[in-house]
């Protein structure tokens, strides 16, 4: 696992490996390139980012609420694996996605998160791209939490989005409250909120443009009592190492 701050190397591998459009999210980001120690060949990419603040199926299973997430700042102790990409033919022929997803739980990533941002990382979210049948199923360290509601708005072209985004910045009085929380931090999914407001102002019914793609939701708890910690029931000193070998390179 090689952490990188080089967008050129990371983006080149990603563009040549995966067809899905990707744009770095606002907030925390750790990028990794996975390299085979023997051959030196690229095996895949990982991005660990600020977690999505609201996914109903996950939040119900964990049992935390907005006070836990924001007042107690437990959302900073969780992250999302927003990129899990194997290179080919590793991905298709050798179940490479399962390997890369398993490496997301490594101690190196947890240590990097704590060193970079000052918060202990106790678990990671991810979602499948299409539907709930996914390569993440059957990985012992990832728990299926349910599915998303499929209520993400379809994005207009980048050209049209930039035009209307700039217009909102200059002309819409409520722009700051649209993309920022009361504490001044960027809300989860700011682009979706901007698109929703664009549609409303243009007289377009947003619900007509949901993609209706229910994605599988997965969570990897790093400790036996991760959920209790996220609910604010215990402190860091009470976290118990997981017995399933999560993050252990030998077991992966």
Show where each model-derived region lies.
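Long, compositionally biased intrinsically disordered regions
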Residues: 158-162, 166-252
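Short Gly/Pro-enriched turn/cap motifs at secondary-structure boundaries
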Residues: 22-23
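Short, compositionally biased leader-like segments
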Residues: 1-12
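Acyl-donor binding region in acyl/amide transferases
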Residues: 10-11, 18-19, 28-30, 36-181
């Amino acid at each position: 696992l090689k952490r990188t701050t080089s967008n050129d190397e990371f983006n080149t591998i990603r563009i040549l490996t995966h067809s899905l459009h990707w744009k770095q999210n606002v907030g925390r980001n750790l990028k990794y390139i996975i390299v085979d120690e023997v051959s030196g060949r690229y095996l895949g990419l990982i991005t660990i980012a600020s977690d999505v603040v609201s996914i109903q199926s996950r939040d119900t299973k964990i049992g935390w609420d907005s006070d836990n997430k924001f007042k107690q700042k437990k959302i900073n102790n969780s992250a999302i694996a927003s990129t899990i990409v194997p290179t080919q033919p590793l991905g298709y022929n050798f179940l490479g996605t399962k390997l890369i997803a398993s490496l997301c739980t490594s101690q190196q990533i947890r240590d990097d998160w704590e060193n970079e941002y000052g918060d202990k990382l106790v678990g990671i979210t991810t979602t499948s791209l299409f539907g709930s049948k996914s390569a993440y199923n059957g990985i012992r360290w990832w728990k299926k939490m349910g599915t998303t509601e499929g209520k993400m708005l379809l994005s207009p072209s980048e050209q049209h989005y930039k035009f209307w985004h700039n217009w909102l910045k200059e002309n819409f009085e409520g722009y700051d409250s649209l993309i920022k929380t009361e504490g001044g931090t960027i809300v989860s999914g700011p682009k979706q909120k901007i698109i929703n407001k664009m549609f409303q102002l243009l007289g377009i019914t947003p619900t007509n443009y949901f993609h209706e793609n229910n994605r599988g939701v997965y969570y990897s708890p790093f400790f036996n009592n991760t959920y209790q910690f996220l609910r604010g029931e215990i402190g860091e000193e009470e976290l118990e190492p997981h017995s399933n070998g999560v993050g252990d390179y030998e077991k992966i």
